[in-house]
A protein has these predicted regions:
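Structural preference for beta-strand elements that scaffold enzyme active sites
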Residues: 17-21, 52-53, 79-83, 141-146, ...
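Active-site groove signature of glycoside hydrolases
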Residues: 132-153
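Short, acidic/polar
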Residues: 33-46, 119-137, 182-189
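Active-site beta-loop-alpha junctions enriched in small/polar residues
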Residues: 25-27, 57-59, 85-89, 147-150, ...
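Beta/alpha (TIM)-barrel catalytic core signal, keyed to glycine-rich beta->alpha loops juxtaposed to Asp/Glu
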Residues: 4-7, 150-220
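Short glycine/proline- and acidic residue-enriched helix-loop micro-motifs
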Residues: 108-119
């Protein structure tokens, strides 16, 4: 077995995932346009190489990445684990209303210019985000829900987002809870104050920046 496809267990989920996951931000058209066929071929190539763990979010392509990921995995007919994210809800705006909004809009190419992601860490926002993701992915349940980019709103995420996710986990509606963060200090606070199954930290464990190893990993 190739190292990228070696499996590790996420304990409470009782699921084994490949050590290497496929992130789907580029499949949503991050910085350059991606066709449905290109996205499908990429996802199926990952599946055929032994990868079974796929990460997505409503932000990625403003829903396009989730739609493409769900369609391709449905074609593959192989078992998989999906993590998607909560904390943003996609809303419809007029072009005039969208003008001046910057949260990810300029980064994604080929998206509907009237659909825009809006931060919402409230209970209602979390439930709406999950409901919409289930529809876009065309699946009946979510393996892992990650609270997304709550670095500047970590207190609200702890007080409002986490309790509803914990309740859904206890009901079996979602299997695992995590955070997808950008800064170690906020992720560390999340680890200390929430009962999490998994942590995604962006850009803090690379060749250039290994701050997660010194700060966050010690708490995991």
């Amino acid at each position: 077995m190739a190292r990228h496809s070696e499996l590790v267990k996420i304990p409470r989920l009782d699921r084994y995932v490949s050590k290497l996951a496929l992130g789907s931000a580029p499949l949503g058209g991050l910085f350059s346009e991606v066709t449905d066929l290109e996205a499908e071929e990429t996802i199926l190539a990952a599946v055929n190489s032994g990868i079974n763990f796929f990460d997505t979010a409503p932000l990625y392509g403003h829903g396009n990445a989730e739609k493409r990921l769900g369609a391709a995995l449905n074609k593959s007919q192989k078992p998989y684990v999906i993590s998607t994210k909560v904390g943003r809800v996609l809303k419809k705006f007029t072009p005039e209303e969208v003008a001046g909004k910057v949260d990810g809009l300029a980064a994604y190419v080929g998206v509907d210019p009237t659909i825009f992601p809006v931060f919402d860490f409230s209970k209602a926002g979390i439930l709406k985000s999950l409901e919409d993701s289930l529809q876009r992915l065309n699946i009946s349940s979510i393996d892992i829900a990650l609270i997304h980019d709550a670095d500047d709103q970590i207190d609200q995420a702890i007080a409002e987002s986490y309790p509803v996710l914990d309740d859904l986990r206890s009901q079996g509606i979602i299997k695992g809870i995590g955070v997808g963060m950008n800064f170690c200090s906020y992720a560390t606070k999340a680890v200390k104050q929430m009962d999490l199954d998994i942590i995604l930290i962006a850009g803090r464990f690379t060749l250039l920046d290994q701050s997660a190893q010194d700060e966050l990993f010690k708490e995991c």
